[in-house]
Amino acid sequence: MAAFATAEACDSNAELISNGDLRALHPIFKIYGQRRCFSGPIVTLKVFEDNVLVRNQLETKGEGGVLVIDGGGSMRCALVGGNLGQLAQNNGWSGIVVNGCVRDVDEINDCDVGVRALGSNPLKSTKKGHGEKNVPVHIGGTLIRDGEWLYADSDGILISKTELSV
């Protein structure tokens, strides 16, 4: 991906911001992974302290997409760890945004993928397979729909109804 500046995107797309087609997530996410800047079409998951669907999704070809995981904001366990970070890298995912925690931070930071999460927790999640895929999720003060576009850099995270020109 070419360098994409979220601040510039906001400055040059005032109309999209005013009509709600371009939205910024609240600045609550910590930055992990080697990609500080990433973007792609969104695939959504809604899970709670269970990462079976996360693994299942990351086992598919990412084709430059971004997996957005609504983990309910739980800080009690991690939904993504080093193995899943490596899986995301190997399968061509551009990034992962977790409304929840990660673990194996050093391993994730070695992966060529962008990861944003609320924090880290060494506890693993349950493995029951509960959750939903391709559903609207509400994260960081923003409604996010499957198929929208996500743009992330060191300044923040934007959600766009359509792909923006870089």
Curated annotation (Swiss-Prot):
Coiled-coil stretches: none
Any GO MF annotation of the entry: 4-hydroxy-4-methyl-2-oxoglutarate aldolase activity
Keyword tRNA processing: no
Cofactor mode of binding and number, as noted: Divalent metal cation.
Sites where the protein binds a divalent metal cation: 104
UniProt keyword list: Acetylation, Lyase, Metal-binding
Similarity comment text for this entry: Belongs to the class II aldolase/RraA-like family.
Name of the protein: Putative 4-hydroxy-4-methyl-2-oxoglutarate aldolase 3
Organism of origin: Arabidopsis thaliana
